[in-house]
């Protein structure tokens, strides 16, 4: 370019570095119904003002970079940039702030959780000006959520397929999770289903290993399902894990499951990836398969309170990507989960409309419109003494999954399943009669022991088993 020639793009261009807050901190901004809203927990480096830190997050997760570039003049930054529109200190924490950021909808590809996360939780998490950064919540506008299929079927369709109403569903993860042959694995599946469970489950790391190849497992589990159905008169299922090293192999396994006529398959959605998960969800919708989702690897992302991403965000992402069940913690078992916080994201999974409620960790009102709901799965270190609390906490629209709490029964797998089914039926009956499960739970279980020797034996084995540790991730002090 000659010294005399000046383009429109270069007319107002001045090279150099500007403070992010000059362009990306806009407290006067009024959010739009179509904006994706994010709440970030920001811990700035010493000497970095919170406004600059919040603006940096908005910039680096949208249109900004570390220096002024002349190509800024070739587009409308005001139209496309993220905006930090509010910052508030975190009560009880030093040098932590919640930064609220609004993103224009045009920044995101329709129907792609992958693209949404690549922007919002991409490189910005390694930004040096921040000591730590955590995405606490997202508001997904209906204009964006309607571009997703969501769960393949949803809660009501699943109940209709299974012909099971008015109670939580019961499951069991087959143990040991690794090392069984396919035939012995199928035997355990049959015994649990015959004893009264609705589902059994592959553990998250059961894929296709030398001791048990996936096709053999699928065949023996299908045989177990059909035999148990014939003997009990109930529809049964086993979560056949279709997770694989490639999307093509994953779909091949799902196709084989469909050919066997089983009702449900499974996917590890975080280790498998959102693109693979969405592909499988579309296949399941088109072919009548339910989809169970395991959240393996979630604690790497969500457990630390000041860095990463809260599970409520992963739960919303799963509902958009697609899944009929997802593991959600137990509150009372061996895995992380505070009660009010857990119930907050359980409602985000199941309900159509959820009001903002900071007492449960919900930062934004969320309207899912007509997107089907997801059944939360309570699993991990639970047994028959937990049944009243689980029934009271999670309600009917849930799956209560007992692995060791079924297979660890002193009389075997089928009696373990019987004990869990009897305990559940007793709790549902007591609740329907108006009894207080939280206060009378142990008494209800003891009464049921009088006519179920299987339950009595289970109660004796697990009467002293508790997991009383403080959760790492708790709600903020009010």
Curated annotation (Swiss-Prot):
Cellular component, GO annotation: chloroplast
Residue sites binding substrate per the record: 123, 173, 177, 295, 327, 379
Free-text cofactor note: Binds 1 Mg(2+) ion per subunit.
Removed propeptide positions: 1-2
GO terms for biological process, alphabetical: photorespiration; reductive pentose-phosphate cycle
Post-translational modification: The disulfide bond which can form in the large chain dimeric partners within the hexadecamer appears to be associated with oxidative stress and protein turnover.
Catalysis performed (reactions): 2 (2R)-3-phosphoglycerate + 2 H(+) = D-ribulose 1,5-bisphosphate + CO2 + H2O; D-ribulose 1,5-bisphosphate + O2 = 2-phosphoglycolate + (2R)-3-phosphoglycerate + 2 H(+)
Record field: transmembrane: none
Matching SUPFAM superfamilies: RuBisCo, C-terminal domain, RuBisCO, large subunit, small (N-terminal) domain
Modified residues (N6-carboxylysine): 201
GO molecular function: magnesium ion binding; monooxygenase activity; ribulose-bisphosphate carboxylase activity
InterPro entries xrefs: RuBisCO, RuBisCo_large_chain_AS, RuBisCO_lsu_C, RuBisCO_lsu_C_sf, RuBisCO_lsu_fd_N, RuBisCO_lsu_N_sf, RuBisCO_lsuI
Binding positions for Mg(2+) per the UniProt entry: 201, 203-204
Alphabetical UniProt keywords: Acetylation, Calvin cycle, Carbon dioxide fixation, Chloroplast, Disulfide bond, Lyase, Magnesium, Metal-binding, Methylation, Monooxygenase, Oxidoreductase, Photorespiration, Photosynthesis, Plastid
Source organism superkingdom: Eukaryota
Pfam families linked to this entry: RuBisCO_large (PF00016), RuBisCO_large_N (PF02788)
Active site per UniProt: 175, 294
Enzyme class, first EC level, given as a word: lyase
Site, Transition state stabilizer: residue positions: 334
Reported function: RuBisCO catalyzes two reactions: the carboxylation of D-ribulose 1,5-bisphosphate, the primary event in carbon dioxide fixation, as well as the oxidative fragmentation of the pentose substrate in the photorespiration process. Both reactions occur simultaneously and in competition at the same active site.
HAMAP family with a match to the protein in the record: RuBisCO_L_type1 (MF_01338)
PANTHER family named in the record: RIBULOSE BISPHOSPHATE CARBOXYLASE, RIBULOSE BISPHOSPHATE CARBOXYLASE LARGE CHAIN
Similarity section: Belongs to the RuBisCO large chain family. Type I subfamily.
Additional information: The basic functional RuBisCO is composed of a large chain homodimer in a 'head-to-tail' conformation. In form I RuBisCO this homodimer is arranged in a barrel-like tetramer with the small subunits forming a tetrameric 'cap' on each end of the 'barrel'.
Name of the protein described by the UniProt record: Ribulose bisphosphate carboxylase large chain
């Amino acid at each position: 370019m000659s010294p005399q020639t000046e383009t429109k793009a270069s007319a107002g261009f001045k090279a150099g570095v500007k403070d992010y807050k000059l362009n990306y901190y806009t407290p006067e901004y009024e959010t739009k119904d179509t904006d994706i809203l994010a709440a970030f927990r920001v811990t700035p480096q010493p000497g970095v003002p919170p406004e600059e830190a919040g603006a940096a997050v908005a910039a680096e997760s949208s249109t900004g970079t570390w220096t002024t570039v002349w190509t800024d003049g070739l587009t409308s930054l005001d139209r496309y940039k993220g905006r930090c529109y509010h910052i508030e200190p975190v009560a009880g924490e030093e040098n932590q702030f919640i930064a609220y950021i609004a993103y224009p909808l045009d920044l995101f590809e329709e129907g792609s959780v992958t693209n949404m996360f690549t922007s919002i939780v991409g490189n910005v998490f390694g930004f040096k000006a921040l000591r730590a950064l955590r995405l606490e919540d997202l508001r997904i506008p209906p204009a964006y959520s309607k571009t997703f299929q969501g769960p393949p079927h949803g809660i009501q369709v699943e109940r209709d397929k299974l012909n099971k109403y008015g109670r939580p569903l019961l499951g069991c993860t087959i143990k040991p999770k690794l090392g069984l042959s396919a035939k012995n694995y199928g035997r355990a599946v049959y015994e649990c289903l015959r004893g009264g469970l609705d589902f059994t489950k592959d553990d998250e790391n059961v894929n296709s290993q030398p001791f048990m190849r996936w096709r053999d497992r699928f065949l023996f589990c299908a045989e177990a399902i059909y035999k148990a159905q014939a003997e009990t008169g109930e529809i049964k299922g086993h979560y056949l894990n279709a997770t694989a090293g490639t999307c093509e192999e994953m779909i091949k396994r799902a196709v084989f499951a469909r050919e066997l006529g089983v009702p449900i398959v499974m996917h590890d959605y975080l280790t498998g990836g959102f693109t693979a998960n969405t592909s499988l969800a579309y296949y399941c919708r088109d072919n009548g398969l339910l989809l169970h989702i395991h959240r393996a690897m979630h604690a790497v992302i969500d457990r630390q309170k000041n860095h990463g991403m809260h599970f409520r965000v992963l739960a919303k992402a799963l509902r958009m990507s697609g899944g009929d069940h997802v593991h959600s913690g137990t509150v009372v078992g061996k895995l992380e989960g505070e009660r009010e916080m857990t119930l907050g994201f359980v409602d985000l999974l199941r309900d159509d409309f959820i009001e903002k409620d900071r007492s449960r960790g919900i930062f934004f009102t969320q309207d899912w419109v007509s997107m089907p709901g997801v059944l939360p799965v309570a699993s991990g270190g639970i047994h028959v003494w937990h049944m009243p609390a689980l029934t009271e906490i999670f309600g009917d629209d849930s799956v209560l999954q007992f692995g060791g709490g079924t297979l660890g029964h002193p009389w075997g797998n089928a009696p373990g399943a019987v004990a869990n089914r009897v305990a559940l039926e007793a709790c549902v009956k007591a609740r329907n009669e108006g009894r207080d499960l939280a206060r009378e739970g142990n008494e209800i279980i003891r009464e049921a022991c009088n006519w179920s020797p299987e339950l009595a034996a289970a109660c004796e084995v697990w009467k002293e088993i508790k997991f009383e540790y403080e959760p790492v991730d708790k709600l903020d002090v009010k």
